[in-house]
Amino acid sequence: MTNVLHLDDVSLHRGSHQILSHVDWTVEEGQHWVLLGSNGAGKTTVARIASARLFPSSGTVDVLSERLGRVDVSELHPRIGLLSSALAADVQNGEKVLGVVLSASYGRIGRWREEYDDFDLERAHALLGALGAAHLVDRSWGTLSSGERKRVELARALMPDPEMLFLDEPASGLDLASREQLLAALTEIISSPDSPSMVLVTHHLEEIPEGFTHALTLREGKVVGSGPLQEVLTADTISTTFGMPLEVTYDRGRYAARGLPAGHGRRVAEARG
C-alpha cells in the first residue's frame, strides 16, 4: 500500500517543555485512524503536524508524498481537509452557509472577491444535501445550532475533494442526537470507494464511528499504542492511555469505555510495566 502520511521520530518542545516525544506513525492509503488520549496528551498537536499546520522541533514528516520543510504548505493545504473548532471560530456570524462551504475552494475563511463556477456551486449544494443540511444553505452562520454547524463544517472540509481529512473532536459539544447524526454521516463517507483517508481526534471511545480501522493512543506526548483498532482498543492499552483502570466494550461496530472500581488499579500498573 502507498503511505499517505509518515511521521518519523517526531518531537516538539516549547522552551523546556516537551510536548511530543519521538512519535512514529504511518497511515496507508485506505486506512482511517483515531487519535485517542486524555486532554493534553498531544492528540491535536500530532494532528496539526500531520496536516501540515505545524512544524516539529525534530524528526521528519511526509504528507501525501511531500516532505514538510521542502514543500510550499499553501499548495499542500487544499489537498488536506480539516474540521476544527479553531477554524469555525473565525467565521463571521453574518456569513451565509453557502459562502462558508464555497470559500474552502480557495483555502480561506469567508469570501474575498472570489468568483465561483458552476462546478463549485453544484459541489457545495451536493455536499450540504448529502449531509442533511440543504435547508441551511441561505442561513447565516450565527443562527445555526452546534449540530448544524458541524454538518456545515464537514461539508466545508470536503469541498476541495481532499486526499486526507482531519477531524479534530468533531462531536465536541453536541447533544446525543446530533452526535449520532454526525457519526452516521462519517460512516457513510468512509463507505464510499473514493473516501479520503480520515484521522479523527477524540478522547471518547463512544465517538468513534463505524468504519475506522486503526488507532494511535497517546499519553503525555508519547505513543502508548498503535495499530488496528481491535488490537489497540483493549482494556490494558486504554487504561494505560488514560491512567486509570477502564473496561472497554464493543457492540455492533461501536466501542465504549467506563471506569472500574479502585481495587483494579494494580491492572494499570501492570499494563505500564
Set out the residue ranges of the language-model regions:
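ABC ATPase NBD coupling module
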Residues: 67-81, 114-117
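Catalytic Walker B motif of ABC-type/P-loop ATPase nucleotide-binding domains
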Residues: 165-169
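Conserved ABC ATPase "signature" region
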Residues: 117-136
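Conserved ABC ATPase signature
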Residues: 115, 140-144, 148
